[in-house]
Amino acid sequence: MRLTKVCLVAVTMLVATVVRADDIDALIGKLDQFNTVSGKAMQVITSADGEEIQKTESEFKILRPGYFYWRTLPPYEQIIVSNPDTISVYDPDLEQVSIYQSEKMRNSPASILSGNRSAIEKQFKVTKSGASNDKKSTSFELSYLDTANADFKKLTVTFKKDQLASIVMHDMLDQVTSITFGKVNTKAALTPAQFEFTPPAGVDVIIE
């Protein structure tokens, strides 16, 4: 759970605003092609000098808007469950559950996939680009409008053949987190009830 400049002249600002709106339309258009999605993910974190720090595998489920489930598999097991009200983060090794109000996590990468247009517009500047050397891929670079409270410098969401393919995040220490999605199912039968989390008996519960 780790995941803009103001133009100087009126004409430039107008152009930037129009481009941003068009690019948000394009991103929302991609996201609106699915209401539910599930699959697997491979996450790799590299340092500023390119050294691999950590590699993990995960499984995820999304019900738009507002519902998100992410389980990182052992040996770094962690479960994140989000609904429109709360986000629960369960660390089995620590026997601890942290519960946050969803509003506090609105600038996370998860909010992009499970959120709505209004949330994206308030949080990000969106720039669309075609993925290099691959005409079937489309990428969207998102940078935070409120850089003072941002967890990442920027993140890039890529779709391939209209399918969610990857998210790449650059944090404030120049570490790069690359998430590659696989076995993506956009016809998953999901309901809000599947995104309710009950802390296991005996674990510490922290309300943030």
UniProtKB/Swiss-Prot annotation:
GO biological process, one term: lipoprotein transport
Keywords carried by this UniProt record: Chaperone, Periplasm, Protein transport, Signal, Transport
Signal sequence range: 1-21
Gene3D superfamilies, alphabetized: Lipoprotein localisation LolA/LolB/LppX
GO cellular component, one term: outer membrane-bounded periplasmic space
Transport recorded as keyword: yes
Spans traversing the lipid bilayer: none
Cellular localisation: Periplasm
Domain of life: Bacteria
Assembly mode: Monomer.
Summary of the function given for this chain in its UniProt record: Participates in the translocation of lipoproteins from the inner membrane to the outer membrane. Only forms a complex with a lipoprotein if the residue after the N-terminal Cys is not an aspartate (The Asp acts as a targeting signal to indicate that the lipoprotein should stay in the inner membrane).
Protein family per UniProt: Belongs to the LolA family.
HAMAP family on file: LolA
Protein name (database record): Outer-membrane lipoprotein carrier protein
